[in-house]
Amino acid sequence: MIITTKGLIALGETEYSIRKQLDDGKLRLIERGYYSTDPDDVFGNEVFISKKYPSAIITGLSAFFIYGLTDFIPEYFHLATEQHSFPIRRDDVKQSYQDPSFFEVGVIDKELEEGVVRTYDLERLLIELFRLRTKYPQEIFYQVLSSFRKIKDQIDFYKLNQYLKRFSNGLSLQKKIKEAI
């Protein structure tokens, strides 16, 4: 389990006891202020990123990879945050700012083997695929689209249409999705 220094102190630990547990191998330092309570714990970077930036949502190529919609391993973690959020200053993160009116639409906590990540559901990712079509390499766009076609029975089209109503260009997106799927 990943826990912060603040979380450890809330559990009654002191800075001294934290250092002692690190020395004894009972805690493992992941990054400044973040620890693993199981020294042998193996977790994905997505899980750590979700824990470190709880208000950010894993989206885009990172989310497509998590869902197995593409075999392309993203170079960066693609995170969505609300407009006017503080910038995430990490070399391995690409941050996109989204309008608060649709930022939370379709957010779920997805269980992975390594832990839980905050991402979008399939319906919202399908919208993101078409909404940001020009930002993805053509080969990856068509690979993800092909994957969506294979799992179209898992997509809740009623929910998809409800989501599309929140976007200003929802009708044109709906038409494009309907033609493609």
Residue ranges and their predicted role:
Residues 25-31:
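A short, conserved structural fragment
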Residues 3-6, 13, 17, 22, ...:
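Nucleic-acid-binding surface
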